[in-house]
Every structure is written in C-alpha cells, then in structure tokens.
Amino acid sequence: MGAGEMAEALGEELEREIQRRWEEMDLLSKVLEKNRDGPLFYFLDGPPYASGSIHLGTAWNKIIKDAVNRYKLMRGYRVRLQPGWDCHGLPIEVKVEQEVLSDEIECKKDIEEKVGVDKFVEKCKEFALKHVEIMTEQFKRLGVLMDWDNPYMTLDNEYIEGAWYTLKRAHERGLLDRDVRIVNWCPRCETALADHEVEYKEVEDPSIFVIFPIEDDSDAEVDLPENSALLIWTTTPWTLPANLAVAVHPEEEYVLARAEVDGEEWHLIVADKLKVVLSVVTDSYEIVDSFPGEALEGLRYRPPLWEEVPKLRELHEEDDRVHRVYTAEWVTMEEGTGCVHSAPGHGEEDFELGREVGLPPHCPVAEDGTFTEDGGKYEGLYVRDANEKIVEDLREKGLLAHEDTVEHRYGHCWRCKTPIIYRATEQWFLKVTEVKDEMLEWIERVEWIPEWAGHSRFKSWVENARDWCISRQRYWGIPLPVWECEECGHLEVIGSLSELEAKAVSLPPGEPDLHRPWVDEVVLKCPECGSYMRRVPDVLDVWVDSGVAAWASLGYPRREDEFERWFLKEGRCDPDDPEAGADFITEGHDQTRGWFYSQLGCGVVTFDTCPYRTVLMHGFTLDEEGRKMSKSLGNVVDPMDVVEKYGADTLRWYVLRSNAPWRDMHFSWQDVRDTHRALNVLWNAYRFTKMYSELDEFDPEEHPLEDLEEHLKPEDRWLLSRINSLVEEVTDAFERYHVHEAARALYRFVTEDLSRWYIRLVRERVWLEGDDPEKLAVYAVLHYTFDRLVRLLAPIVPHVAERIYLDYVRAGDDPESVHLTDWPEVDDRWVDEGLEKAMELVRKAAEAALSVRQRAGVKTRWPLRRLFVEVEDPKRLEDLKDVLARVANVKEVELGEEFPEKVPVAEPRPDKIGPEFRSLAGRVIEHVKDRAEEVARSILKDGEYRTELDGEDVVLTEEHVKVTEDLPEGWEAEEFEGGRVYVFVELDEELKSEAWAREVVRRVQEMRKELDLNLEERIRVWIETDEEIAEAVEEHSEYVRGETRADELHVNEGWPEEVDLEREWEVEDRTIRIAVVVSG
C-alpha cells in the first residue's frame, strides 16, 4: 500500500466507517449490557458551555475522559456515560445579544423594553440547544463514546429542581443570606459576578496624588497648622465622588511636611515609610512634625470634589461621621502615601470600615456603570470615561499634586471582557465562610492528580474564599427559588416543582417551565399573614448550575433511585460517606476556582460532603511558543482541522501522549505529524502481518502458540515478554490516571519494539517456504501480540484498534467489537525480565555499531566481518549474538568483559603534572610517554601507577594522565550505556561482493514497488553493469532471485525488446542498468 493510500486508510473514511458500524450495532447499549453486573464507576462529565464549537482544550478534555471510560468499560465496570451541557448564564446571553439579537439590543434594558424577556429567554434556549447539537456531532467525530441521546442539560426542569433543592437546604441550614455588600459588578452585563468569574488583565490606568484639605482638627490628637492636608494616591479617580473617609494605620508613624505644590504652600500628611512620594509631588519639602497614625483619627477634611458633587456636601453636613480620618489595620506601607481614600460603596475594605464606624455605603454609580444624579457634575458619564474629567477638575482646583499612569492587573468580566467595578448592592450569598473548615477537610480526603492540584492550589483558593454571591440580575438562568411576602417580608425557598405546585395560588398556563418569565408569574400565599408572595427576580450564578451536577444530573430529588444507585453506590453509603459521589472528574486547572470549587461548596451545603472522589486536573492548550491561543494572534488551532487532515485517532494519540495532563500543552504540528507517522507504523506492521499470514493461510487456532513453543527464537520470546510487560505498564498507568504514560508506552512499543526491532528481525523468516515451524512461530507470536496490543490501544486510538481487531484478530465467537472484549491480563509464563534487559543492551550495542559505520563511511547494507561487545556480564547476551549479528549486519559477534586486542595508553597532562612535581615534571612526562601502556594498565587495574625517579617516589593517577586506548588497524570503537562495541570496518573482497548483490536487490525491489506488484507476482530481470558488480550478482544469484521473486536473472547477457520498467541507477559512482519484465 502506497503512502497516499495509507493516509486515506487511516483517515476520515476508515473512522467514519467504524463509527457507522458502532451506531448500527448499538455499541453503547451492548457495552452497558455486558457490564450490567459489574462494579459501578460514576464518571461525571464537567459540562462545557453550549455556546460555540469545540476548541482544542475541550477536545483534549473529552479525549482524556473517553480514554479513561473506555479503559474502565474493558475492565468490566458499569460506567455512567452521560455527557453534560452548561446551557445557562452569561456565556449564552452575551452570544445571543451579539449574534442573534444584535439589531435589537444595545444595552440590558433593551431586553425588557424592546425584545421582551419571554422572547429573549426563548432565543437563549434555541441557541443553547443548537450548539448542543453542533458540539455533540464534533465530539462524536472524535470517537467519544457517551450516551449522547440522554445528556444532562442544566436547562431541564428536572435539573433545575436539583439546584433548587440545594438552595432550600442552604436556607434550612442558615447558609443562604441576603445582604448589602460590595460585589464585583459588570457594567455591561449589569449584574453581580462571583470572584471566580473575574479575569485579571494588565491595563493602564491613571495614577494620581490628590490633596484632601483638613477642615477641623479639634477631634484629633494633633494640632495642625493652616493649609494642612492629607495626601492620598489612587488609580480610580472615578471613585472620588463616593469618598466618605480616609484610613490610616494606627501604629505607623506619619509626618507633616511643608511643601510647595503648584505655587501654593501646603502641610502634607504622609506615612513616614512612604515619605519618598513627597519628592514626586514637589521639588523640595521640610519635615516639620511627626505623630502616630492613631493621633490622626477624628481629623475632618473637605473632599476635593466638594463643589462638583453636591451629594458629598449634603452627606458632610448631615452626618458628622462623614469625611473623617479613621484607623484601619489593613492600610499598607507597600505603596501609596499611607493615607487611603475610602469609598464604602466601592471597596470591600472601605465597606467594612464604613460598617464599623457607621458610614452609609454611598454609591453614586448606576447598574450600567454611569453616574447617577448623586454624581453631581459627572451625572450620565461612564465611570472610566469620567476619570479624565475628574483629573482635569482636580488640576484646575490646585488639588492635583501629581499625575501619571500605571500598568496593573485589573478585573474584567469573564464573558464580555468589560472592566468590572465594585458596587455596594443587595445580593444573595451562600455563606461559604461558615462551612470553609469542612470544605478544607474534604479537600484532604479527595485523591488529586497531581497531588499539588488540591493540596496546594485549590486548598489555597478555599482558604481565602469569601461568601459566594450567587444572585445575578439577568434572565437566562436558574431562577432564584425565593418568594417574598409583599406585606410582612416572610421568605419561602422552594425546593422542587411539586412543592411549587402545591403552594402556588395559581400557575401560568401551559407546561411548567422553571425559567423566567413563567416562574415569575407564580404567586404564593404567605403562611404568616395571608398576603401574596412574589419571586425575587434574580437568577442564579451559572456556577451553581454546574456545582449541583453530581445529584442534579441524576434527577435528584425527583428520582431518588438514580441517586441511590450512583451517588450512594446502590445504597451502601450515606451522602457524607467518603465513598459517595462521583468516582472521577477531570477538567482544566482554571476549575480550581470554578467547577471544583462550586461542586465542593454546593456539596458541603447540601449533603455535608464533597461530591467527587478523584480529580485529574489538566492544563491549558497553548501554541508552540507557549502563548495563549487567540484570534488576534492568529494562532488558534481548530481540532476539527487536525481531524480532517490526519484523523481523530492521530489527534487522540497526540494529545494523550504529548505531555503530562496537568502540564500546559504546547501544540505542535510537527508532533502531530510524528504521531500520525507512528499510526502509519502500526498500520504497516498490521498490514505486513496480515498479508503474510493470509498468503500462508495461517490459522492461529490450528497452530496455537503453545504448540510452537520449542520453535520460538530469542526474539520471539522477547516480544512475548515485552507485550506482557506492556500490559502491566499500561494498566498501571490507567489505574493511576496517568494516561500520558499509557499513551507513551504504547507509542514506544509500536514504533520501536514491534516495527523497528521485531519485524525487522523476523522479516526473512516469513519468506521461508511451506509450513516451516520457524515461520509459523512468527505468525503465532504476532497474532498473540496484536490480540493484546489492539485491546491496549482501544481506549486511545479506538478506530484503528477496531479495524485491526475486526480484520485480523477477531475469530469465531469473539465479541463483535474490540470495545466489547476484556482488558488483557499479564501472562506471567511469557514474562522474562532478564531477556528484556539483555535485548535492551543488544539494541544499544547495535545503535553504537551503527554510529561506528557512519563515522567510517560504511553503509548499513554492506556486511562487515567482526564485532566485539565489551560488557560486564557477557553470558547474558550469549543467546542474542545471532540477533546482534543480523541487526548490525556482521558475520561474527564476540562477547567479553574486555576487548583483548585493544592497547591502553596513557597521555601525560602537563598542566596537572607541572604544579605537583615542579623540577621533576619533565622527567615524569617523559617517563609516561616511554611507558604509556604500562602506566595505563596499572591505573586501570589499581587506580594508580608508582615508580621512583631521581630518588623520589612518584605516584600517578587519572588526575595526572589521560588514559585512552590504541586499536589495531581497521578497528573502531563506540561506547553505549552498559558497555562498548568494537567494529572491524575494513571490507574484504567477499564482503564487497555480497554488498553489491544487496545493492542490486534493493533497486529491483524499488522497481517492483513502482510497478505496484503483489508479493507473489514473479518477474524476469536483466542487468547491465561493470565487471565487479556483475561477478558479485552472479556469485549471489540465488540470493538475488529469491529476494526479488525473479524467475530469470540475466547479467550482461543482452537486453529484452519489451520491458515493463527500465531504470539506470547510480550507486557509489557506479552505474547499474536494470530492466524488469513481469512474468506471464
């Protein structure tokens, strides 16, 4: 088969044919039926967002999952193969706004006022379901075996009930809280965001020093001169219209510095440790006083935007606590001035300080990020656009001490990429801080792969976790199941559809749909006062959706049987038992603050448990230079492009073997091509085996391996040992979820052990005539090997493994798919570790011999006379001398602990001898040269050489001399790990004759290939060349005819009138003309 045919055979046509076969035979049902009584393996699929096409990262993720699941299935496990889809939230909403309804939606209010919530929600649902279909087909094309007809989707009512159940449990346990707090806020999406929904990027922002004039020092412990002021630093000028306080550190020293700023004299207060900033705002200054930070508490100042923001004047006049200095331990001496501008409506620490001293969480910024009427002069301006205007006003008022810019990391919305702001708003929270200790305990019980994924990275995230803001002011999501009484404020948290139906005064018409706007219309009757209760309009953070997947995907609480079977292991354990929950999950390392976290939080809140037992964390996909893939860089690789070009199996094997899963993958097209070549090597090995076996009508049942045991050669026994060692190695890797080790071990076996070693060794044996037992032994060994190899390969390259199984391995009543076979067990009777180690030495010796050939300019096809292998234990290689002779293409192999014909010699090191022996150095150097062999042998044997020169004792070691060796003429040496080879590289006339015969054979075989002849087709050959080559061909004519399948061989005997192919070859500057005629 040519290279073009090979690529086609291994590509789309083969894979689609195999996939059609799986579908027609209903492979999924048969696999599940086969394992119906096996042990449970609850695999939980982390749901990708149904918002686009798959990318390289999602492909890698699903391939890892599929490899693990296929392995577990072959081990007899009942694997839960349900795929999942994340269908709600901003990932979908933003796409619908931008791609579906872009003509109608410019901002959030357009959704309600122009489009309508009902239409918007319906479009979001359509969008999600459409992309579920698209991505399902793409995952199927990758060969992923899952129950694609029965996925869990977060938009299903049954799933939503699972989330509602968790919220009800949180309410019952006092872990659901409504509060006004500072939250991350996306002004474009107009909703709160959780900490794990904020992405940080480097941005450039203003960096300004602002003067806050002191108005009154009567309530402080300092007596300040006129024109005293606090100097503050900020990178968010837009927060100054909300300033209500300044914080200082109580225990740090502060200084009062007289300085001139823009022509006006000020007495500026800054922290002593940060007084270097004074040189930034003024050319010269003088320290006139100092005092501890606590002495400044109570100072009252006038905010710098006093005239521009009337609301600040109003608050200043109404509340004596406003615009004063307060002490706070969190004030840092790392940057700024030590005087921190505090806006309780815009910062978490500011907010807590305000709560402590009684300041209101004043926030003059609307949901869309523009200033409200309370923003005074800046009303209607978007906050970041207001920065420039505010800085300009401060400059005109003489209160801008210095302005610059700074590059720093700033939070952005994870979906629309807009810079966030911090706002004080009323939100709903899961009180994670109250169950944090329990969450940390569960982290210790989970098996993390790698270990540091949980015990370092994830643990650190949980230790610093704050209460989880779970409410969103959006539309397409799981509605917050909280109803509030219009009169008395009583709250009801609903945990299921049946509970909602039971408590509803009335239900909207049509089938229940637990989404907005249907659920918004459900009214309850207050059990406390009898008034109406209406639902709080928020929806849930989409991370709550996936966070409840371990039970919601099972239909719990509606379907308790599935929950008991999978989550509770057929009722053998309670929800908080260490064995309960999903057995295995795997996602990218960004999920330490995403899905791993949301599941743990929801699990502890709902069941006092972590809902997963084993976590494999994988990395990100980057380009070859380690850069993140992005459209702007033009380095995005579409996995479907790889599949189209090289096939799904190539992509699968590549991503599984390229690196340890927890490391970031640096995608390389060259490595993809290398992997495809390895698949070709596997295919060629299979084709070779199948072709010759069929030609000889070999039947493994008629010629079982056991019956041919006495005819097995060392290389046969070695391959039988290697395939069983491979079973152990691959099994161990899968058991530890180190799928990369399994993929790499298989890659090495296919490319090195099977193809480049064993088949190379036995190729001549398959050409033996008749039912020669040595040939039959090869076929039996290869059949045994492929029977095990295709099963080991099945989880990684399922299509090619299936094709080889069906076309070559399967026989009689064997299962109709390799994926219905059992995982192979180690066959100990064939395992021979000593033989494997010995063969490894032989391979290294052969590689060393090849290096000698290359250095000497002798081609591998040209035979050599002798090779000596110098090793510590020569006896262990005795049975493999013939193997080494064949591979190294030498007539004779000798073994020993030392090559007897080498002569060790010592070369003096003058730079070492001179300083030590001084005046005697010249005599020592001459002595070494005169007795080079004697000195060398003594040092090699005893580690030193002793003599007496001019009456002085001389002791020499390898420090003083360099020990080398002289070899007889014609010999070359090369070291390898474990020994050294010596090769006699001179060619005598007999060897040259044989070499020329081989060169001719090679050219005729290339011509057979060009004619696309089958193995059994016979030919006639004519050769014209010089006398030396002609004599060589004549001398080895039987060999030439046998190797080329030639009925006739004519050397310098005329030329045929008609030929099928004629070529003139240049070999070693000699001309060989060859004609081939296909026999009739």
UniProtKB/Swiss-Prot annotation:
It is found in: Cytoplasm. ATP binds at K631. Coiled coil: none annotated. Pfam families: Anticodon_1, DUF5915, tRNA-synt_1. GO terms for cellular component: cytosol. Keywords: Aminoacyl-tRNA synthetase, ATP-binding, Cytoplasm, Ligase, Metal-binding, Nucleotide-binding, Protein biosynthesis, Zinc. GO terms for molecular function: aminoacyl-tRNA deacylase activity; ATP binding; isoleucine-tRNA ligase activity; tRNA binding; zinc ion binding. Signal peptide: none annotated. GO terms for biological process: isoleucyl-tRNA aminoacylation. A motif ('HIGH' region) lies at residues 48-58. A motif ('KMSKS' region) lies at residues 628-632. CDD domains: Anticodon_Ia_Ile_ABEc, IleRS_core. Its EC number is 6.1.1.5. It comes from the Archaea. Monomer. IleRS has two distinct active sites: one for aminoacylation and one for editing. The misactivated valine is translocated from the active site to the editing site, which sterically excludes the correctly activated isoleucine. The single editing site contains two valyl binding pockets, one specific for each substrate (Val-AMP or Val-tRNA(Ile)). This is Isoleucine--tRNA ligase. It comes from Methanopyrus kandleri (strain AV19 / DSM 6324 / JCM 9639 / NBRC 100938).
